[in-house]
Design a protein with these regions (language model features):
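Flexible, glycine/charged-enriched surface loops at secondary-structure junctions
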Residues: 164-170, 347-350, 359-371, 407, ...
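Short flexible/disordered coil segments
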Residues: 289, 332, 365-375
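Nucleotide/pyrophosphate-binding catalytic subdomain
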Residues: 2-352
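A conserved regulatory-domain signal marking ACT and ACT-like small-molecule sensing domains
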Residues: 2-9, 25, 41-43, 373-450
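Glycine-rich beta-alpha junction loops
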Residues: 122-123, 232, 311-313, 362, ...
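Generic beta-strand/beta-sheet core signal
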Residues: 120, 228, 269-271, 308, ...
Length: 450
């Protein structure tokens, strides 16, 4: 049954100009909290009524692996700050050769001094790669013909976009990758099983190919451009909940090393994929490219992160359910986080955390309607005295297909550990509880799970 809510999340206002983020963090094997205080900073206005703080006091509770506490990279060879603009293009935006040309045109026309572009795999390619693994695990010989279809999709796209040495170089790399994939899929076929690292390695090839093609198209316009395999830079730590936590300290070190060997003003980076501290390929899971872009934005301290989609911005409600839904011009980080957590098609909730630490605004724009200004997500609006303004309801979000479980009985009242036993059983089956309600009589406990 549908459940609609916009509950408070653990992002709360502190003193004027401050904010507090509460997030789980891992130190050894314990969950801990770290409070990080930034120096007093100067505030300047962004677009419209949004505020961008260059150097504003903030308190952040987050993972010790989420934030570099030193500025050693700031003084190195890699320039950081407002000179960088970060763009992210999803699979729909790079779905075919014409759309890749449109993306390249946006990149070329952006007048930012330096640009980092994060790209997903071409539309449907990630699903095709997962299907390859499924067929190989099932010992279905058709995985070979399915791999040929993936090869042909990218070969045909490259033929439309590239020529000369750029085409020859890409096709050589493409065929080399496909030969490696055949060997890996053959191993999966024989074993009848694919490890998570094997699966992540196979699935991540879509981003590698789209990044290389886009970089080559940008170079055709006469601009210096280099593509980045994010596995060489982005380091994440897998958690037990099928998620990963970015290791900013190690990622900054690797980024500095990468940039010293690839100094350029335009970088086309792969989304979705990363490496573990042991250099094992991994992914940021579904919708991970948005998360990749947010992490990169934080690493480069960019002045803005633009996420390009096929919609004009963030709607006040699902337009398929509410015909009067309108595009929102602005959202605070907290509002966007809450709406996305409760089912709105905005961003993955984790995408907001890295950019919020550095007050980097996120702009949601439509690649296919460049005249639409989109939606800006930034710090909550303040009045002239620095107090956060209370906004009216911005939107509604729903989560469909939930199950409500009610556990009741007269023997539950006053019995210690009943709730612990219930939710331990829920944890054992891997279910995520998103709402809990208990009667004051203690005779029942109700909770919602997907």
């Amino acid at each position: 049954m549908p459940v609609a809510s916009l509950a408070k999340v653990s992002v709360s206002p502190a003193a004027a100009g401050d904010f507090t983020v509460r997030a789980p963090c891992i130190y050894g094997k314990r969950l801990v909290s770290n409070r990080v205080s930034f120096g007093k900073l100067r505030r300047r206005s962004c677009i419209g009524h949004c505020v961008r703080s260059e150097l504003q006091t903030s308190r952040v509770l987050g993972s010790v692996t989420d934030l570099s506490l030193d500025n050693s990279v700031e003084n190195g060879h890699l320039p950081k700050g407002v000179s960088w603009a970060v763009h992210k293009f999803g699979g729909t935006c790079v779905g075919n050769s014409e759309r890749i040309k449109d993306v390249a045109d946006v990149v070329v026309k952006d007048d930012s001094e330096r640009k980092l572009v994060v790209v997903s795999a071409m539309a449907k390619v990630t699903d095709m790669m997962y299907d390859l693994i499924h067929r190989a695990q099932s010992r279905d010989d058709s995985y070979l013909s399915a791999l040929d279809a993936v090869l042909e999709k990218h070969r045909a796209t490259a033929l439309d976009l590239l020529d000369g040495d750029e085409l020859a170089s890409f096709l050589s790399r493409l065929h080399e990758d496909v030969n490696n994939l055949k060997a890996m899929l053959r191993a999966i076929y024989i074993a009848g099983h694919a490890t998570e690292s094997f699966s992540d390695f196979v699935v991540g090839h879509g981003e590698l190919w789209s990044a290389q093609m886009l970089a080559a198209v940008v170079r055709k316009s006469g601009l210096d451009c280099t593509w980045m395999d994010a596995r060489d830079v982005l380091v994440v730590i897998p958690t037990g909940s099928n998620q990963v936590d970015p290791d900013f300290v190690e990622s900054e070190k690797r980024l500095e090393k990468w940039f010293s060997q690839n100094s350029t003003k335009i970088i086309i980076a792969t989304g979705f994929i990363a490496s573990t501290p042991q250099n094992i390929p991994t992914t940021l899971k579904r919708d991970g490219s948005d998360f990749s872009a947010a992490i990169m934005g934080a690493l480069f301290r960019s002045h803005q992160l633009t996420i390009w989609t096929d919609v004009d911005g963030v709607y006040s409600a699902d337009p398929r359910k509410v015909s009067e839904a309108v595009i929102l011009k602005t959202l605070s980080y907290q509002e966007a986080w809450e709406m996305s957590y409760f089912g709105a098609n905005v961003l993955h909730p984790r995408t907001i955390i890295p950019v919020m630490k550095y007050d980097i605004p996120i702009v949601i724009r439509n690649l296919f309607n460049l005249s639409a200004p989109g939606t800006m997500i930034c710090r909550q609006i303040e009045d002239e005295d620095g107090y956060k303004l209370d906004a009216p309801v911005k939107g509604f979000a729903t989560i469909d297909n939930l199950a409500l479980v009610n556990v009741e009985g007269t023997g539950m009242a006053g019995v210690p550990g009943t709730a612990s036993d219930i939710f331990s059983a829920v944890k054992e089956v891997g279910a995520n509880v998103i709402m809990i309600s208990q009667a004051s009589s203690e005779h029942s406990v109700c909770f919602a799970v997907p």
